[in-house]
Amino acid sequence: MFDSIVYFFNKSGFVTTLVLVWISLYLVMTLWVFLYKSIVLKIELRREMQSLSNILNGAQDAPEHFMFNKKRNDETKRYSNELLQAWKHQVLKQSTTGLVVLSIISSTAPFIGLFGTVVEILEAFNNLGALGQASFGVIAPIISKALIATAAGILAAIPAYSFYLILKRKVYDLSVYVQMQVDILSSKK
């Protein structure tokens, strides 16, 4: 198997090799962003669920966040709506970082793969024209080799898009818990 991979890269053009390396980097980035954000969002979600539970039970007055250290009006025992909104926006901004990488990868990887395929097919037709051979037995292996770049692009895009949707849902869940805390703290008198 390793020999066939080496043979493929030896027979491929520069652009196809570049495209496959690029798509491989995309795949590594996809896995890294997904694993990292999954862990971070799981921790944040657990923290905000606990914070909401503590606020509802009266165990704490505000979320465990540096923005709430001594920012409460002690006379009314309330936090300003502006502070609550700023906290909410900060949590959402932090939780969505990295998602744009998955979005870009899922939308561009197929086109990068297609570009590699088109260039490889153009090179193949150029070589076929120079040789004067145009039989199916000659064309089929060249086109199948060229289509590997498109397949690789699609292969990189599918997990990127799937992981994007999974993480987007986790961010939504986090935003619901944050909004519930904002609503509760805004309604306290």
Curated annotation (Swiss-Prot):
It comes from the Bacteria. The chain crosses the membrane at residues 14-34, 99-119, 147-167. It is found in: Cell inner membrane. Coiled coil: none annotated. Signal peptide: none annotated. It is a multi-pass membrane protein. InterPro entries: Biopolymer_transpt_ExbB-like_1 (IPR017269), ExbB/TolQ_transport (IPR050790), MotA_ExbB_proton_chnl (IPR002898). Its main location: membrane. One of its GO terms (cellular component) is plasma membrane. Belongs to the ExbB/TolQ family. This is Putative biopolymer transport protein ExbB-like 1. It comes from Helicobacter pylori (strain J99 / ATCC 700824).
